[in-house]
Each structure stands twice: as structure tokens, then as C-alpha cells.
């Protein structure tokens, strides 16, 4: 029988405090220097997520298409340049934010950050790539609808947020197919503006890396005040209950539980 580890109180937890820096244009940047290996992660975070588009698929599709081409590089050139320099780029959309995460070797940092800046500031929204992404998203949705965990998550969101919130509306193949390049461009212009941006640099941070970030992102003109993502307040009144979704022939069951707590607009958030 496997010997279980001893239960004891946690001790010696070290929480690293980030250093704050302001880029030349006023963008806030946090840096956390930890680790011994010469690698780093650069996160570019924007206000605006699934709550803020016509439907929650808009922000997800925008995050996906950013890597598919800029006004100076196509998708293949972006992929080859990052791969050649040992870098990897992840793009993600959450309820209230979109995040681009660049993982890089420090020795190639100054070569790949300009590519990230080009992706952030100059996306081209190529029609063919958008069509491919929509097909992939629709196919992924069909597969997910066969999974009990996805159905539980979807039903919970509908019950908790209601149809008056983007987070409570189900994603459909029709809502995916209706997204256009012009809609993504408009969302990008509204939310992916410098005033809505924050930067986090972590890893074995070196002084010259801060200068590279400032050179690539600190020159972008900032106009207007930062925008606040839409509220995630449920559109229906909370009432404890149990919802059962029957899926014939399912080999597993999934349970999802939740309740309202503080919102982003609450003073205690």
C-alpha cells in the first residue's frame, strides 16, 4: 500500500513581490525576477473579454486570429520566426480579459518581442484564416456537446447568469459562423488599445529586457481613459436549486456547483 505523506502545516511560503515600472506612454508593467534559467514569459493583458462582444465567441475568435497574420507578416512567417528563435506564443480570452503570453529564451528576447508587438498592434484579420478558424471552432463545439463536463458547464452558466448576460448565452454554430473580420477589427480597435493594456514580465529578468519592452510597447500613442469590461452580474435572481441534464448512453457523470460571491464592481473585490 502506498504510504501517504505526513499531514502538516505549510511553512516557508515565499511570495515574490513584483517590481512596478511605467513605460514611456504610461502603460503599467510588473516584473518578477525568479528562477535560474535564462528564460522568460511576457504577458500582454487587455481589458475586454467574453462579456464584451456581441457574443462570447468574438473575443475568443479575435485571440485566435491574432497569430494568423499582420500587415507585414503572414501566419507561416510568424510561426517560423518564433520557432527559429525558440519562442512560443499563447493567446487566451477569459470573461473580462484577453492575454497574449510569449515564452522566450532571454538571448532571443529582443528578436521576438517586436514580433509580438506587431501581432498586437497590426493584425490583418485574413479572411481565409478566419474561415478556417470558424470551421475548427464549430467542429470543436460539436465534439464538446458530446461531453458531460461541457454540458454541465453550459447548463450552469445558463442557470447562473441567464440570457441577459453573454456568459449565460450558449455558443452555437450560427453564432460562430456569423463573426466577420470587420467585427473583429472593431473589437480590436475598441479593446486592444494601449490604454487598456497592462504588461507582466517574469522569469530571469534582465535590465535590458525592460528596455526592449519599453521600446516595443512604450511608444504606442495612448488616447482616452482605460475601459472597464462589462459586469458579470447575473441577469436573474439567484435561487438554490438542482438541475439535472439527461444524456442517454453517457459513460460518465459530471457535477458542477456554484453560488454568487463578490463581483468586480463590489468594494471588496
Model-identified regions with their sequence ranges:
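Scaffold signal of the M16-like zinc-metallopeptidase fold and its non-catalytic homologs
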Residues: 1, 144-194, 214-216
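An aromatic/glycine/proline-enriched structural segment found at the starts
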Residues: 1-14, 19, 163, 167-170, ...
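Short beta-strand/turn micro-motifs at beta-sheet edges
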Residues: 29-33, 87-91, 185-188, 242-246
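M16 family metallopeptidases and their MPP-like homologs
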Residues: 30-32, 37-64, 74-121, 150-174, ...
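Structured segments of extracytoplasmic/periplasmic soluble domains
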Residues: 64-69, 81, 85, 119-123, ...
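Acidic/histidine-enriched alpha-helical segments
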Residues: 80, 123-142, 226-235
